Amino acid sequence: MFRRERSIPLRGSAAALSNNLSVLQLPARDLTHFGVVHGPSAQLLSAAPEGVPLAQRQLHVKEGAGVSPPLITQVHWCVLPFRVLLVLTSHRGIQMYESDGSVMVYWHALDSGDASSVQAMFARGIAASVHFICVGTWSGRILVFDIPAKGPNIVLNEELAGHQTPITDIATERAQGQDGVADMVTADDSGVLCVWRSGPEFTLLTRIAGFGVPCPSVQLWQGIVAAGYGNGQVRLYDAGTGALHIQISAHARTISALDLAPEVGKLLSAAEDTFVHIWKLNRNPESGSIEVEHCHGECISDTQVCGARFCDPGGSSFAVTGYDLAEILRFGSV
C-alpha cells in the first residue's frame, strides 16, 4: 500500500507532455532532484526525504533568432558510469548540463535541412547507455552522443535509422557486458518499437510492428520490453524475439508515463484517465514466460496525469505530475 506524502510546490505547473517528470536520487546527500517542463522553461527542484523543498532553478532554451521562445519537450537526468548529465530537448536543439543545471556543457542544434516546410522540428526521448547518451528526433532518427568522463568534449557518434515517424521515448538497461543482449528500446508515434544492442556501433536486433496507435512511453527490464500505448494498453514483449507475451487493458485513456524499479521489477503506469498503477513483472524460470501481477492503484482526482516516476530503485516511493497542477505529488509505501 502507498499513502500520500507531503507534496512539493511548483512555481508554475506541468505542461501536457508525456513523460513530464524526471527524478534523480542522491542517497549520499539524502536529496532527490525533480525536473518538470512548463512551456519554454524547465523547473529543477531539490527536496529532502520529507518533501521539504530546498532549492529551485529554472532552465530555458538557448535563444535563437525566433520571435517566440521555443518550447521544451523533455528534461531528463542521464546517469552514466562516471558522471551524471541533465539533458533538455526542445524544438530548437539539445542542451546538456551538469547534473544541478548550473553549467551547460554541450549544445546541439537541430538541422532544419531534414525538415519539410510543414514539419515541426523537435527532439524527444532521452536515455543513457554505457558512455553514450541517445536522443530521439522528429525525423525518427536517434542521435548517439559519446560522453567523455569529464569536460565538454561531447561528440555526435552516429545516427540510428529504424523509425519512419517521430521518436516518443527511449529506454535502456545496463547489459553488464553480456554479448548480444538487448539493452536499448526506442518507440515512435506509430507504435513501432526497435530493440538495439549498444556498443561502438549500435546494432538493431528486433523491430516490433505497431498497430496504428502511438507508443508514448517504453521501459526495458531483464529482457522484457514494457510499452504503454495511446489506447491505454500496456504490452509486454520479449526483447530478444519481439514476441508479445502479455496485453493489459491498464487504462481508459492514453498512457502518459511508464517507469521501472529495477531492483524489484515493479512497473509504474500513469495515464490521462487520472490513474496510476503499479505492477510486478516476473519471468517464470521454468517456462521462460513473462508474468505480471497488479500491486496498487491510485486515483489522482480531476488530474490529467502527464508524468510519474519511482523515487528509488526499490519502488517504495513514487512521484506524479499533472497538467495545470502546481505541485509534485509524492507517495510512499506503508
Swiss-Prot record:
Keywords attached to this entry: Cell membrane, Cytoplasm, Fertilization, Membrane, Repeat, Ubl conjugation, WD repeat
PTM field: Cross-linked to tightly form both dimers and trimers by TGM2. Cross-linking enhances the activation of EGF receptor-mediated signaling pathway. Cross-linking is inhibited by EGF. Ubiquitinated. EGF increases ubiquitination.
Keyword Endoplasmic reticulum attached: no
Intrachain disulfide bonds: none
Top-level taxon: Eukaryota
Tissue-wise expression: Widely expressed in the ovary and testis (at protein level).
Subcellular localization(s) per the UniProt record: Vesicle; Cytoplasm; Cell membrane
Major localisation: other
A cellular component annotation (GO) from this entry: vesicle
WD repeats: 162-206, 208-247, 250-289
One GO BP: fusion of sperm to egg plasma membrane involved in single fertilization
SUPFAM superfamilies, alphabetized: WD40 repeat-like (SSF50978)
PROSITE patterns attached to this UniProt entry: WD_REPEATS_2 (PS50082), WD_REPEATS_REGION (PS50294)
Annotated GO MF terms: protein homodimerization activity
Domain notes: WD6 repeat is required for cross-linking by TGM2.
Cited function: Plays a role in the adhesion and fusion of the sperm-oocyte membrane through its interactions with IZUMO1 and IZUMO1R/JUNO. When cross-linked to form dimers and trimers, it has a regulatory effect on ERK signaling pathway activity in response to EGF stimulation. Colocalizes with the EGF receptor in WDR54-specific vesicle where it sustains the internalization and controls the degradation of the EGF receptor after EGF stimulation.
Assembly behavior: Homodimer and homotrimer; forms tight forms of dimers and trimers. Interacts with IZUMO1 and IZUMO1R/JUNO.
Protein's name in the database: WD repeat domain 54
